[in-house]
Amino acid sequence: MFTLRPNQALVADDILLDGRLALFHQSERWLAVADLHFGYELSQRAAGALVPMWGMASIRDRLLQLVEEYRPARLVILGDLVHDRTAVVEARTLLEQLRQVCEPIVVAGNHDRHVRGRIEFLDSWETDCFHFHHGHCAVEASDRIQIIGHHHPAATISDGAGLRLKCPAFVQQSGCWIMPAFSPWAGGVQWARDEESRVWLCTPERILRLPEAQPVSA
């Protein structure tokens, strides 16, 4: 029997959420991530901002670590592979590295529009039960669960004494799952919890399922 670590959670039959911001299907052997925004620091430097050159290395190392650990047949990148065209060469190099160990499936996001002629993208990808797309465009209703990115969900916990910690979150709703942003530069958008949302707060060392919002009494 598979033993879960503190940074893993079973969020559905055969599906693991990893606190390093990835989703893995154990029997179908796909690993999904979203919103890498690869090359964000290059984009900011080109615009004159003095930001450290550590984001791309962090993304690459974490991806390769996840792929080595889970051994997926396919790595599904759910849009916004790059932040803009500044890092297209570096992004292509990353994909070549990944192709040595699995099949990258790169779904197009809104930030990818300027590099679609230089990197191969899909508008969406499907399995029997899941429909993967970025989430920035409306799609036709389907009996498959949608798995999307784009929204950069985050959640906040506090100790009751004034300390508050905001972390990336994975959100499950009926018919739609929203991935946290994989980019270390993504601050995340506080997710407005409701009765329909199951929210998992993600850190590299631990995953916490937040209490579900209670219905408002009349």
Task: Go through the PLM ranges and name each one.
Residues 1-78, 82-218:
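Extended recognition/assembly regions associated with phosphoester-bond processing machinery
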